[in-house]
Amino acid sequence: MSERFCIALDAMGGDHAPDMVVAGADIARERCPNVDYLFVGDEERIRPLLDKYPALAAVSTVRHTPDAVAGDAKPSVALRTGRNSSMRLAIDAVAAGDAACVVSAGNTGALMAMAKFVLKTLPGIDRPAIASFFPTLRGESVMLDLGANLECDADNLVQFAVMGTVFSRTVLGLLEPTVGLLNVGSEEQKGHGSIRQAASALRASALAKNFRGFVEGNDIAAGTVDVIVTDGFSGNIALKTAEGTAKLYAEFLKRTFKSSLLAKLGYLLAHGAFQKLRLRTDPRRYNGAMFLGLRGVCVKSHGGTDAVGFANAIGVASDLVVHGFNEKIRDELARLQAALEAAALSPESTEAAAV
């Protein structure tokens, strides 16, 4: 997509909204020159902020609403009472065709509930999944689900594998991303029934040549595969564990380099290397979790991020629109279904069924 398109922004979602949202959009404006912005929220607070960024204001409109979804609101309550909230109206803009996608740093559960209710799921997708990036020794990988579905059956996991593959191709530019199912061991007999059934289905699918079987927790950071598929329960624990471990080692380094004069001197000598490491592991670089499987593009920013992180979330949304992400998911699902039907009609499968 080379023509201009609009991104709807939940201007009141996040710990530092609307300041962070407006400042982030201005940063993203340079990266995404073909984008217009629809800010949804309290116009009295948004307009003065836009006045600070004339170039952004020139490509922006504001849709006023005084209501916002509270960060601690239950999804069911937000869905029932938040019809006029900035989050809901931003999603409505996508459903109405006024925007190509929506970005919000608001309540994750509420955003998922509203997006699924308003936008619905793509044909062939039973449940949407949350996907995001992980830094690895080999670059970056994609992991899903990160919390939308605590329990998943084999069909859900296969659908996640398809969506993760398309996401990796679209955003990371990998032609043949490898896929693995997160499990408690790499042996075929390990894991519960659903994950073993999913593995069997993937081996018989159009993704078979890139499916690497089961991967374990230590394979995430190693970058053993490009796409890691799991249920939302395990995925969310893995995500939070990785975030906590990164903070732990950052604190360890800080304390170590403050421990003595010689340690401080060592830090000064290695300052350039540590700056590269800091940039490589900066969580703002990986901000922007995608709700995959919906009929519209919906990206969730971390609620506590700053303008740089929010700009990256906008960049993810823009990439998905530009590369026709949802259309590619539809094509991949159709190809997968055709391969499964062909396998079912093959002489080998017919003979096996007869036996």
From Swiss-Prot:
Pfam families attached to this UniProt entry: FA_synthesis (PF02504)
Pathway: Lipid metabolism; phospholipid metabolism
InterPro entries: FA_synthesis, Phospholipid_synth_PlsX-like
One GO biological process term: phospholipid biosynthetic process
PANTHER family according to UniProt: FATTY ACID/PHOSPHOLIPID SYNTHESIS PROTEIN PLSX, PHOSPHATE ACYLTRANSFERASE
Subunit structure: Homodimer. Probably interacts with PlsY.
Designated name of the protein: Phosphate acyltransferase
Gene: plsX
